[in-house]
Amino acid sequence: TQPFNITALHPTYKKVKAHVGIVSMSFSPYTLAGLNFAGGGLEYTPGKWKIQGFGGRLKKQVAFIPEINNIETMAYRRWGGGISIGYEDKGYGATFILLKAADQRTSLSTIPNSATITPMDNIVASLALKGKIGKSVSMTAEYASSNLSRNTELTEQIDRKTYAKTVSPLVNGNQ
């Protein structure tokens, strides 16, 4: 459900800007791109650097209501956070982004047997590069990778030998 009255604060002091309340931030088109969330975020821009971070509730829980049989609209409460670190100088730059989101398994007390909803877990990493070709043409390229677990309640885990060792502590990966 989308509230009609959205409260947010965006205080700024020198090179720091905060976002508090129901807010949105953008890291890149392939990672975090204007998603509304309830929480907080910071942007720090010292010189040629741009550092951003956020954390909060990405999705509200929608419980099952038998009277209206809302199986299709049920949702787990989803929490997430992320960081973006970028550097740019004279038209050249690089940005690294890391995001994590996970459904809270205990947020739904009743799930009908006919429901297909499962709690998910995801981590996204991205690297964006920016450069100039000549004096008037610039180019930006971004590579983003997502490691989505569609059902964190499965007990059978994937083979750790085929799973990235740097990602496995961060995501509950399964088949």
Label for each model-derived stretch:
Residues 1-4, 12-19, 23-27, 31-175:
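Signature for the C-terminal beta-barrel architecture of outer-membrane proteins
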